[in-house]
Amino acid sequence: MDLFDKLKELHEQGLAEIKKATDEQTLNKIRVELVGRKGELTKILHSMRDVAPENRREVGQKVNELRDLFNKQLDTTKAKIVKAVLAKKLEDEKIDVTLPGREGHLGSKHPINIILDDLESYFIGMGYKVVQGPEIETDHYCFEMMNLPKDHPARDMQATFYIDGEDLLRTQTSGDQARVLEKHDFSKSPLKMVGPGKVYRRDDDDATHSHQFMQMEGLVVDKNVTMSDLKGTLEMIAKHVFGQDRATRLRPSYFPFTEPSVEMDVSCFNCDGKGCPICKYTGWIEVLGAGMVHPNVLENAGVDSTVYGGFAFGLGLDRFAILKYGIDDIRDFYTNDVRFLKQFRKEEN
C-alpha cells in the first residue's frame, strides 16, 4: 500500500473514530493517535524518505490538509460534547423556583455581649472612653500599681494563674486604670474611662464560679470628685440595667485600691425586697464593688493625690447577665447550647 492509499484509509478511519466519540477523554485519546507527536500523521511524515522525490510535495500537502481537517473535526466534536454535558448537568440540577424557600437560621448575640454592648454605649453617652488592656498582664500593673505590693495580705483574696516570673493572667481589669492614669494629661481634661475584658481566677467551675469571666472596670479622676458623684453614678448604672424601679443601697466594704470602699446592692428581683431564698431573706442582692480611688494608686501613677481624686467601680458582666435574665448556672454561658442562647434574641435591640 502506497502512502496515498494509506492517507485515504486514515482519512476515513479517523473521521469515523471522531464521530463515534462521546466524551472528552476518548476524544483526547483519538487526538493523540491521529495528530499527536507520535501519531499516525507524524509517522507518515517520517516515512517521506521512501517517497519518490517528485511525489514528496504532494504527500506533504495532503498530510497537512488531513491534519487541519482532523483538528477542525476534533474541536467541533469537543464543543458538542461540552455542550451536551452542560445541558445534562443543568437538567439534573435545575431548581424548581415554585418550591417554597427555606428559612435561614439566624444566630443571636451572646447574653454577656448584649450586656457589654449596652453598657459601653451607655458610658460612651456619658463621656467615658472605652479602654482595652492586655489579658496577659504583669504583676506590676495587676497588683503593685493598684496598692497591692508583694507582701500585701490582700493578695490572698485572689488565686492567680502565673505564667512565668512577672507575667500572669489578669485577675481583674484594674490594671487598665494604672496604664491610663500614667499617660493621661489632666491639664487637658478629666479622666473618665471604662475597661471591659476577660479576667481569670483559680476557681473550681460550678453554678456560681468560673475560672474565666467578664469584668468591667470604671474610673473617674478629676479635681473635687466626691462620694456623692460615685453614689449617683452607681445608682444610674443599676437603674439603667435592672430597671428604674430597683432600689439601691451602699454598704461599707474593703478593697486595697479604694478608700473608703463600698459594695452596692439592689432590691431583690424575686421578692422586691421582702425577703426570699434567692436574696437569703435580706431583700437585697449584691451587684458590684466600688470606692474612692486610694491615694497610693494615684501617686503610683504619678498623679498628685493632693490635687486630684476620683472614684472607681468594678462589675461582673456575667453576674449582671445572671441577675438581669434570671439564669441559674453561670456555666450555661459557655456550653454553646443554641436552645439557651437563642432565647436572648429579643434582647438585642
From Swiss-Prot:
Binds 2 magnesium ions per tetramer. SUPFAM superfamilies: Class II aaRS and biotin synthetases, tRNA-binding arm. Its cofactor is Mg(2+). It is found in: Cytoplasm. Mg(2+) binds at residue 259. Belongs to the class-II aminoacyl-tRNA synthetase family. Phe-tRNA synthetase alpha subunit type 1 subfamily. Tetramer of two alpha and two beta subunits. HAMAP family: Phe_tRNA_synth_alpha1 (MF_00281). This is Phenylalanine--tRNA ligase alpha subunit. The gene is pheS.
